[in-house]
């Protein structure tokens, strides 16, 4: 499958220039067809019994676990299927053994969901320290300077939502390991666009919803928990799906007269302990598995190179128009997000509305005064999409190629050549 061919999986591209995977992405046909097959099964119950029908639902959903594990080079027993990134981060906050006086470190560029689970721990005496960004970037040395003897957790996005800054996770991982600090990562703006290998970059928790760059907006994502970390956690919720299946399976178990609710159950030692059951979002897991299979078919390294080529093209085009690039230029700190600014927040919102009228989908996003018009370059996009955006921006914004923005663009371009 090539990148032009994969566009056929996304019929919305026939009507719209979709450059907003960082918000909510499009679902491919393979995912919606897999879900439709599941819905047809629920309509007709082809299994011999309702019990077998239920078991088959679990089996269909479970395919998402090995696909998610493959995405980040984890083991399947380190993966739990969760509702969203928010769900995964909340599990981390509720499971890490913290005591009054402990501190959590985040940056001021984060989406609020990175902060909210820790804010909720304030009644338990848990505090938050915030690392201020430096020109839209949060370098590991900035984080190191803010660590204290009370810091127990660093919670950080792999890619920042407002400007696409990509953290040096490998360096951050080494720092946290050296200091004995838990590392919790929000990877929702990276995975599906830029590869991440948890074997090479150890983290304790990694949460990723399916609705953005994984092209699975069906209410299911995944949570990775490093095996060594699992042994130290305090799972906040339990259900019978946390229990290892009895000999012969649950179907035979439920038909046994001697069973009682209070028995000597063996709880799973895998990340699945966070899937409480007994029913789940089957359609979401099935859609996620299908979307992940498509990503694996395309190849993550190929997707990354395609993404970088598109972002290079977009950045160069914006610079030629004298428009301020908010996103870091150097590849090692870049992702599929390109954020730019044509002036004030009102100016950027006005431009976004003009683009939406032309069926060019982008967003305006800010945090801590960092942001602007945010475009997303994904594997289903092509240079024609980027050119259409650039043409629309050029016709909507007075050209500033000879002004101060052009000079800034030139400096950014020179820095990019030195750092990419």
Predicted regions, residues:
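Pyridoxal 5′-phosphate
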Residues: 1-411, 415-420
């Amino acid at each position: 499958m090539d990148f032009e061919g994969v566009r056929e999986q996304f019929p919305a591209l026939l009507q719209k220039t979709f450059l907003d995977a960082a918000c909510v992405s499009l679902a491919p046909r393979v995912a919606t067809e897999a879900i439709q097959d599941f819905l047809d099964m629920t309509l007709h119950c082809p299994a011999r019994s309702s019990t077998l029908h239920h078991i088959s639902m679990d089996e269909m959903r479970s395919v998402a676990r090995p696909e998610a594990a493959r995405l980040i080079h984890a083991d399947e027993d380190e993966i739990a299927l969760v509702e969203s990134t928010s769900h995964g981060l909340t599990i981390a906050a509720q499971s890490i053994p913290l005591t009054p006086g402990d501190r959590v470190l985040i940056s001021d560029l984060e989406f609020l969901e990175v902060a909210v689970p820790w804010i909720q721990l304030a009644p338990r005496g848990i505090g938050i320290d915030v690392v201020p960004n430096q020109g839209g970037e949060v370098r590991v040395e900035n984080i190191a300077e803010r660590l204290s003897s009370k810091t127990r957790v660093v919670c950080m996005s792999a890619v920042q939502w407002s400007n696409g800054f990509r953290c040096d996770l490998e360096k951050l991982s080494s720092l946290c390991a050296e200091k004995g600090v838990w590392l919790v990562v929000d990877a929702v703006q990276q995975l599906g666009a830029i590869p991440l290998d948890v074997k090479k970059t150890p983290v304790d928790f990694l949460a990723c919803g399916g609705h953005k760059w994984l092209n699975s907006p069906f209410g299911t994502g995944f949570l990775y928990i490093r095996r060594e970390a699992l042994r130290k956690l305090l799972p906040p919720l339990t259900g019978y799906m946390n229990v290892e299946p009895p000999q012969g399976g649950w179907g035979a178990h439920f038909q046994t007269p001697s069973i009682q609710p209070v028995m000597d159950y063996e709880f799973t030692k895998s990340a699945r302990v966070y899937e409480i059951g007994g029913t789940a979002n089957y359609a979401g897991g099935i859609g996620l598995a299908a979307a992940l299979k498509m990503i694996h078919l395309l190849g993550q390294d190929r997707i990354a190179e395609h993404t970088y080529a598109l972002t290079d093209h977009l950045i160069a085009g914006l610079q030629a128009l004298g428009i301020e690039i908010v996103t870091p230029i150097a590849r090692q700190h870049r992702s599929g997000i390109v954020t730019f600014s044509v002036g004030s927040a009102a100016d950027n919102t006005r431009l976004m509305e003009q683009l939406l009228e032309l069926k060019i989908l982008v967003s305006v996003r800010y945090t801590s005064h960092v942001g602007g018009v945010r475009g997303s370059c994904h594997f289903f996009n092509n240079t024609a999409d980027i050119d259409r955006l650039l043409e629309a921006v050029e016709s909507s914004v007075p050209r500033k190629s000879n002004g101060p923005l052009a000079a800034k663009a030139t400096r950014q371009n020179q820095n990019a050549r030195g750092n990419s």
